[in-house]
Amino acid sequence: MSLSAFTLFLALIGGTSGQYYDYDFPLSIYGQSSPNCAPECNCPESYPSAMYCDELKLKSVPMVPPGIKYLYLRNNQIDHIDEKAFENVTDLQWLILDHNLLENSKIKGRVFSKLKQLKKLHINHNNLTESVGPLPKSLEDLQLTHNKITKLGSFEGLVNLTFIHLQHNRLKEDAVSAAFKGLKSLEYLDLSFNQIARLPSGLPVSLLTLYLDNNKISNIPDEYFKRFNALQYLRLSHNELADSGIPGNSFNVSSLVELDLSYNKLKNIPTVNENLENYYLEVNQLEKFDIKSFCKILGPLSYSKIKHLRLDGNRISETSLPPDMYECLRVANEVTLN
């Protein structure tokens, strides 16, 4: 496999999880460019449908020839997108605009909704103050991280949208609550590093992964997570959660595999379902280990599935652990204490 092919192969792998990995290879590494390419960009002959225009100090979107499906415009100075910018590439599937100077007012008309084959749209590290749109129904992966977003438009009708990354913005709960209505395919939602003080209503029950860490959340409504029958990964670390703000069965969700409550103000270990495998509670104010937080009943077939448990940065010492702890945590590989 040529090095240029390997580069795109890595990007394709990164795309399968909804993540985008930034490989900063110089343009010369891609080899000879295909003739069907903007002169200032590079289109590897082995992957002529990909056009790389990274780090060229571009101030506008270059001419994109027909046949391009993967367009990379990272690390430029692009501050506007004209409505006809992608007129020749209606079959564009990936559009990567990370690290530019884009503002909402300078993204014209229905420039994205015209791209009926678009699956990935990444506009991370720009100057957006609200979500972009309208968007095509084909979209699967939307990334708008590291902007200044305070307002979300509705994503209703985006039936294929599976991944949404909104971390490192300025969102509050009122801006979030109505935005995700009707997203029946949404599996991954990252709202970390925002200004959310209450858990937003109206989140899709289809979610497998929900990240709300590094916000200002202090309480959890009773049975809030009960309706999320598919939820597997939940992060609420670096919030303001205390015992008084967590009803008894808040995290008794049978589908949960991983729960992160680290860096909060908890004095007692919240009760979890026996199916939970990874539980992160480091740097709280925990004073005791209550086995009933993990096992309601102990028996040959009644035990916790916990594999990794972090309790470091608390007031629990090894000598204070109950003698029957490992009868409950019998499959644990790692229990981290101070």
UniProtKB/Swiss-Prot annotation:
Changing residue 199 to P: Found in patients with amyotrophic lateral sclerosis. PROSITE patterns: LRR (PS51450). GO terms for molecular function: collagen binding; extracellular matrix structural constituent; extracellular matrix structural constituent conferring compression resistance. Disulfide bonds join 295-328. Sulfated on tyrosine residue(s). Contains keratan sulfate. LRR repeats lie at residues 67-88, 91-114, 117-137, 138-159, 160-181, 185-205, 206-227, 230-253, 255-276, 277-296, 305-326. Coiled coil: none annotated. The modification Sulfotyrosine is found at residues 20-21, 23, 30. InterPro entries: Leu-rich_rpt, Leu-rich_rpt_typical-subtyp, LRR_dom_sf, LRRNT, SLRP. Residues 28-66 form the LRRNT domain. This is Lumican. It comes from Homo sapiens. The lineage of its organism: Eukaryota, Metazoa, Chordata, Craniata, Vertebrata. The gene is LUM.
